[in-house]
Amino acid sequence: MYKTLKTIYKKSKIITSIILIIFTLQTKILFAQNNSNNIDTSDLKEIINLVEKNKLNKAIQIANKNNSVDLINLINWIYIFTENEIEIEELIKMYEKFEDWPKANLIKVLIEKKIGWESNNISHYQFINENKPVSALGNIKLANYNFKSIDMKQIIINNWINNSFSKNDEKFIMSNYKNLFDNNIKYKRLDYLIWNKKWSSAYRQLKEINSDYSNLYKARIKLSRKEYGVDAAIKKVPEYLINDEGLTYERVKWRRHAKLSSSLDMLSNYLGKNEKLKYKEKWWTEIIIHTRKLLKEKKYLEAYNLLSNHKQTNTYNLSRAEWLLGWIALTHLSKPKEAQKHFSNLEKIVNMPISVARANYWLAITEKELDNNALANEYFEKAAVHNSTYYGLLAEQAIKKEGSINFINLQSKNIIYEKNESIFYSLRLLARANEKKYSAKFINGLFQQNISEQDIINILKIFEEEKRPDLLVKACKKAVRLNIKFQNCLFPYPNNIKINEATQYIDTALIFAIIKQESEFYTGAISRAGARGLMQIMPFTAKITAKSLNIKYDKDKILSDAEYNIKIGSKYFSQLYQEFDNSIILSIAGYNAGPANVRKWLKIYGDPRNEEISYINWIESIPFSETRNYVQRVIENYVIYQKVILNNRINSLKSINEIINNG
């Protein structure tokens, strides 16, 4: 009884708090002047902290003190993303208020979860009738409410197959609509659940199928989860199901992890069949890992043949496959005509500056190999248009052309509101709070909406004014996908970062180049691996480097003191630079992947310092996709930060050719 009363009391407090927020918001709109520009950073941080802890009354008190409508809006918006319990009626009010805000669909998802299966409240079902459901659960609940037509039955079936649900929701769906789900539908759903590692739902679904298919799916689960008894489980799978796509995929992956060479044979044989892959993207990981392994073993034709059967259709994987096929054909098989086909295919399907420059650069190299110099120059010209990218810069040097970069001058732009201006005021407050979590959600949500060029300029200008180069870079990366001219906004000058002593180890432009790629200039960055701060230093590396500097090691300071972080990171890079005989490229690779990996790659792929291999091909030989991308991005960052942003403070600029040719 006590617990029930306590729960009711807690819920009533939450409802009261939300009503108070909404009431305060309405009165502020009527009577308050906007005061967002004067809000203190410490107040913003405290408000976010209070909202996360469900202390709404205290958060409102601070908002009232600041007399800001936007702050009240922001409290409401952040509250949606906390794990605090919100009643359905309040969620509906919130959706009505924030329908045009970033991530508003999350409110709909929460509402759809809370609507009862047998709710007597017609208004709840009217809401999802009028506001198209965004979740599978919402679609099934709406179909359940309107369950009269064949269409509604099909909606239930389609959403059931390709989604997972809570145990209680599954129980209701199964008890009411089991007659809709024949064996084929049950198999399809279990197939989906295992591919997507939804184990709890998969185990429940296993109880609904016959023994043959049960044995198949049990074997797949054991393989995927690396459980004991894999061989015995596979033996129980009947012969007519042994070539199931999901089972073959899991067997290939399991054998690769076990370092068994038979994984390649199984993969090649399955891809060689004329069968469509249902989960092409999942297969891509296995294909590319095995291809790179074959390249490492210098089995170039075998690598080419395996990759030729990739069967990828999404643009990202298809472009990666076409590029690598072209590169293998050109550099390892001496088949420029074959390479030409692949690079042409690549050029037709890409539109992002980095990829367009890459495709045209390699087309140019291929045409040179075929003695088509005039055509090669045309492709170099096309690549050089994108001269803030790695291959664009290389193309520019190849034709001895140095074009200017048309940076967008945000200072000359005006903020003009084409949509709810409160959204932009709230974005400014988040930027000022010097936090990343909610800012990132806000940015992602904005770019998922129908966003105009002026909206993008507003966003970027706000981040520039609030001295948040990290958020500016994040937003620019999104903006480039909508309009490639924003590529030239990707290199902000970080006025809020002090370099000072670090320049005695490496130059300022290189420091900025590394920081931009490591943390995007966010001082509070912590990676999943534990790397910390602007230069993303691992604590163990920082400890050793601090000792070499004769300074005290302080783990907390790596994160809290940007200058300390940069000093240690720069010193560590300079040590790599010495180890690799003043090779910038090898040092960059070592900074990302560790010097031990670089030493290993030099033995496997050749040493560009001894001209055993060109630096360009050595970089493309790196087996880690993250490191390949990292090296290219840091090099382009380095050139741009020298060439444009730091031009007045550098006596001589290193071109990309100098960096590449001298390592």
Stretches with model-predicted labels:
Residues 3-16:
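Bacterial N-terminal signal peptides that target proteins for export
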Residues 30-78, 85, 405-424, 432:
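N-terminal leader/linker segments that initiate helical-solenoid repeat arrays
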Residues 35-36, 60-69, 81-84, 93-101, ...:
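Solenoid-like repeat scaffolds
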Residues 43, 76, 108, 139, ...:
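TPR repeat positional signature
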Residues 46, 74-79, 111, 142, ...:
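Structural register within alpha-helical repeat arrays
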Residues 50, 115, 146, 193, ...:
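Residue at a conserved register position within TPR or TPR-like alpha-solenoid repeats
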Residues 53, 118, 149, 196, ...:
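Structural motif corresponding to the intra-repeat A-B loop/turn of tetratricopeptide repeats
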Residues 70-73, 77-79, 89-97, 235, ...:
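Catalytic glycan-binding domains that act on GlcNAc-containing polysaccharides
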